[in-house]
Amino acid sequence: MAETESRPTNFIRQIIDKDLQSGLHKQIHTRFPPEPNGYLHIGHAKSICLNFGIAQDYQGQCNLRFDDTNPDKEDIDYVNAIKNDVIWLGFEWHGEARYSSNYFDQLHAYAVELIEKGLAYVDFSNQEQVREMRGTLTTPGTNSPYRDTSIEENIAQFAKMRNGEYKEGECLLRAKIDMSSPFMCMRDPALYRVKFAHHHQTGDKWCIYPMYDFTHCISDAIEGITHSLCTLEFQDNRRLYDWVLENVTIDVVPRQYEFSRLNLEYTVLSKRKLIQLVDEEFVSGWDDPRMPTIAGLRRRGFTAASIREFCKRIGVTKMDNMVEMSMLEAPLRDELNENAPRAMAVLEPVKIVIENYPQDGVELLAAPNHPNRPELGSREVPFAREIYIEAEDFREEANKKFKRLVLGKEVRLRNAYVIKAQRVEKDEQGNVTTIFCEYDGDTLGKDPADGRKVKGVIHWVSAAHAVAAEIRLYDSLFTVPNPAAEDDFVACINPESLTVKQGWVEPSLAKVDIDEANIQAFQFERTGYFCFDKDSTTSKLVFNRTVGLRDTWAKIGD
């Protein structure tokens, strides 16, 4: 798969083009500002590709800034995981990674400035009272009894907040805007709250922490961000973004623009819901291959290039829509079809005994690593008297549409000989345990000499040489296309989202170096694309199914 090389066009890039042409900006400066309270997911990948992609295409800069204003939910492990994901996706941020906490002193000074201008006040109303005073979407709010406290008293009270003289929840600093505004975010929003929590960057220096809407815009301005790109749920908050910057003394005034967030079928992208899946052990962790996290997708075998290509294909708009899972898989399937070396693996084996093959005979047959790329070379596959094939590749009786092994008929073994099934052996339950065959020793790499047609081809492994492997077959985590819309999304979890098979793989796979940072993918012929899992060891191979050979989502939708 070749990544799309042409520069994408969208409404944000059109705005940037106009800003550059008009001379409003000489250099474009964007940022990616995740909160370090969880792992990044595929929705974040869209934002990463947008912000870093714009900086690359316009020879600008993109900052990585951690929005770390909520210390009791954040962790340095999340910080490190986020950095790793951005790098893995192929991007490099400008300068050092930044933190909103870098600006806590400046943010505090700006809060004092708002108080001195009569634009902020300390409110001692409790949480329920604040909620009631806000009003509703159809009724205006009411002023707090603390709204008209003098500037001098507010300065003194805010200093006491800073000094730890008030308890958590006892008071908060609010902006003084308009309690009758039709926009809820403008009804005297909170700017600071008391929180006695250890911070992963600032330690115990602070016991008051700024709110996101106050921090976000000022951090953008301090860093010289020209275009602050957010998802549509922050559209109304742009009014507060602009209000803060208009009322503090700051040189750079960035502009916020909103685009639609990613909604992907058969998964959830809400961080709260993802945390619930992890905490309640519906999945094995943040990097469970069923998770839509970048770590989970990477472990499943998705490549950075395929994710970047997916983000290019879905584009950037202002219209929310649900993206089909097939859109995510298509670039990956294209890439793996082009690049993944081939191998043979049998997931549900049944034994074949080739009765006319020498008892102790072994041949090393040449098998191409890729049918269309001879430069990838070939490998040796051992062939012997006893082999395994997939149980589903054999029937005692079948119609003409079945092109695999049938009793009394022939089939070709991939990269090997033509065999014919003669008889079977069954267990007490009537299940076929062994198929006895004969092979045509003159058909290696060529058709039968007498011109008879053998249409079917099946894969196999040598019973004596194959390596045991645990093979994990992943499916969608949910049974409905939009689980987030359900009252109880966990009730929609797919009980068959993971099936574990104990199969056999050709011995060449045991010689591959297992590198978690650079996961090796393979096409298991006729089965799908697979990769090593991090649980794999030299004594126990573990493979994850990354994606099937063909798109199966269309069938689910029918």
Swiss-Prot record:
Pfam families: tRNA-synt_1c, tRNA-synt_1c_C, tRNA-synt_1c_C2. It catalyses: tRNA(Gln) + L-glutamine + ATP = L-glutaminyl-tRNA(Gln) + AMP + diphosphate. ATP binds at residues 35-37, 41-47, 231, 261-262, 269-271. The keyword Nucleotide-binding applies. The keyword ATP-binding applies. Keywords: Aminoacyl-tRNA synthetase, ATP-binding, Cytoplasm, Ligase, Nucleotide-binding, Protein biosynthesis. One of its GO terms (cellular component) is cytosol. Its EC number is 6.1.1.18. PROSITE patterns: AA_TRNA_LIGASE_I. A motif ('HIGH' region) lies at residues 34-44. GO terms for molecular function: ATP binding; glutamine-tRNA ligase activity. Belongs to the class-I aminoacyl-tRNA synthetase family. NCBIfam families: glnS, PRK14703.1. Monomer. This is Glutamine--tRNA ligase. The lineage of its organism: Bacteria, Pseudomonadati, Pseudomonadota, Gammaproteobacteria, Alteromonadales.
